[in-house]
């Protein structure tokens, strides 16, 4: 629920955590702390900034969850957390250096050097979602800029591009007259050789390739 600048998200997260705790029959004293990963800039102060997809300009996630759950809370950028997970138990096992790109509602990125996250001054050294790749874009990104990677290579971006192609091209595609278009539908259509879906995926690939 991202309404009202995402002010209900923390409560939903806390309720979900408590539900999982009850499901597993864990007592409070068995819970040492809580780790949360989130889009946006997760500062060392526990404040998440610039998580535009959640409606957060500056949300004190750590403080609010700590007060709500009465537990220690650690907040980490979602791409950094995913990269550490891959390094530990996934595709990065056995390596000390890696780059990871996450594609979902938005676009994230992380860099691991010598087994540690390259954070940079503000914790977002690996983030590529709001790099400008198409300077002639006329639609504004949620961040306020134009031509960001996320406008093309995210799930929302893929849907946006597909809708624009549906307006311009011969609508001989399985995607025509699809009221609730999803990224999965587009990708499935591309796998089946649908020309318009393939064109949309090509735009995604060019944007991501330019950023990398």
Where is each model-derived feature located?
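Glycine-rich phosphate-binding loop and adjoining helix at the ATP-binding site
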Residues: 3-18, 22, 29-34, 40-99
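Short glycine-rich anion-binding loops that position phosphate/pyrophosphate groups of nucleotides
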Residues: 39-42, 104-106
């Amino acid at each position: 629920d991202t309404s009202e600048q995402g002010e209900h998200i923390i409560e939903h997260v806390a309720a979900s955590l408590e539900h999982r705790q009850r499901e597993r029959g864990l007592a409070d004293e068995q819970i040492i702390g809580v780790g949360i990963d989130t889009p946006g800039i997760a500062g060392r102060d526990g404040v998440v900034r610039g998580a535009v997809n959640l409606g957060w300009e500056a949300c004190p996630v750590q403080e609010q969850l700590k007060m709500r759950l009465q537990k220690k809370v650690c907040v980490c950028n979602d791409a950094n957390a995913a990269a550490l997970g891959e390094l530990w138990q996934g595709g990065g096992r056995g390596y000390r250096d890696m780059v990871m790109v996450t594609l979902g509602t938005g676009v994230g990125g992380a860099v691991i050097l010598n087994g540690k996250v390259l954070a940079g001054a503000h914790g977002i050294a690996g983030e590529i979602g709001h790099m400008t790749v198409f300077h002639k874009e006329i639609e504004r990104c949620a961040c306020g800029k134009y031509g960001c990677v996320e406008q093309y290579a995210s799930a929302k971006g893929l849907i946006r591009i597909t809708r624009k192609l549906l307006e311009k091209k011969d609508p001989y595609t399985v995607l025509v007259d699809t009221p609730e278009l999803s990224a999965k539908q587009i990708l499935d259509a591309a796998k089946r050789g649908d020309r318009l879906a393939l064109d949309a995926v090509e735009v995604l690939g060019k944007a991501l390739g330019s950023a990398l």
